């Protein structure tokens, strides 16, 4: 008798589970359908706005804020975090549509990545670095992708940076990471100070293979033609972003990573460190693998949502 009751109970449980699964699947389908409709509406909204602007970034930003800020301010605070994640996806859909306009996307790319710097004929192909066995190996690897490369030996890391900053050299080489010390923040500070951009990285191993130093090839701007680069070119590169907290309760990292995932960028690495002017706040260095399809949409999102974001590099790993 007990066995039959147990069997009956199990059968009932199985039916309840099956019914619940069916209901959940039905809800998933309805939710997916609603999201698709929502995406279409956001895209239509962005199309209308793009046609009705003067094409300037300031005008677009003003309209963007009027749409999304008002929606967020009305959000029910009890489900604020959930609504924030939805609104981030809405913003990405908006940015995706906006960035499809060549005129608008070119302006946003210039804001985020800067202009191509003019290189004098004397500086063209000239690479400054402090000479030693490791930097010689890095120079040899980097020079394969440089037209008519010429080495220039400097006496200090500061002068290495100044050669590029003043326009005497097109590139310079700096160490940015080691197996012993990790990310070399003193050199990242120099990169910030001289407004340099990482174009390539190369790892030099010690003779016994037990340790390594990662070097960066840096210039005043990103590689020429990156704005119109092919998918093959971009998909082999990473983008490195520096962003800082503005308050203890607010971290930009969550929304940036959500936006990156929505744009199919792959999170490769995240480093954090206390800010020099406030040790209670953190600065983040985020490395993402680029997907060319939504790369412009992601940059557009950063321009709208995180203008304090600084793009340290768009680079390939040289083999």
Label each PLM-derived region with a short phrase:
Residues 1-319:
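Domain-level signature for soluble enzymes in the chorismate/prephenate branch of the shikimate pathway
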């Amino acid at each position: 008798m007990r066995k039959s009751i147990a069997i009956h109970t199990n059968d009932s449980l199985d039916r309840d589970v099956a019914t619940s699964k069916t209901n959940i699947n039905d809800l998933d389908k309805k939710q997916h359908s609603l999201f698709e409709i929502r995406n279409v509406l956001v895209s239509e909204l962005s199309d209308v706005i793009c046609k009705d602007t003067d094409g300037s970034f300031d005008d677009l930003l003003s309209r963007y804020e009027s749409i999304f800020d008002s929606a967020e301010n009305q959000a029910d605070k009890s489900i604020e975090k959930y609504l924030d994640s939805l609104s981030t996806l809405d913003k990405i859909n908006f940015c995706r549509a906006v960035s499809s306009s060549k005129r608008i996307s070119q302006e946003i790319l210039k804001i985020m990545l800067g202009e191509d710097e003019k290189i004098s004929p004397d500086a063209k192909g000239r690479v400054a670095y402090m000479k030693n066995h490791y930097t010689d190996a890095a120079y040899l690897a980097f020079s394969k992708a440089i037209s008519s490369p010429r080495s220039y030996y400097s006496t200090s890391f500061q002068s290495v940076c100044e050669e590029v900053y003043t326009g005497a050299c097109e590139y310079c080489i700096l160490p940015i990471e080691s197996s012993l010390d990790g990310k070399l923040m003193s050199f990242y500070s120099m990169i910030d100070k001289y407004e340099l951009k990482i174009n390539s990285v190369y790892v030099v191993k010690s003779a016994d293979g037990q340790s390594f130093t990662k070097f960066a090839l840096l210039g005043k701007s990103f590689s020429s033609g990156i704005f119109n680069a092919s998918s093959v070119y971009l998909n082999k590169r990473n983008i490195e972003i520096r962003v800082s907290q503005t308050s203890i309760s607010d971290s930009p990292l969550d929304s940036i990573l959500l936006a990156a995932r929505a744009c199919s960028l792959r999170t490769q690495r995240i480093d954090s460190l206390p800010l020099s002017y406030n040790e209670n706040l953190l600065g983040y260095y985020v490395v993402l693998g680029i997907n060319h399809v939504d790369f412009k949409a992601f940059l557009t999102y950063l321009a709208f949502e995180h203008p304090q974001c600084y793009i340290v590099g768009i680079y390939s790993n040289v083999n």
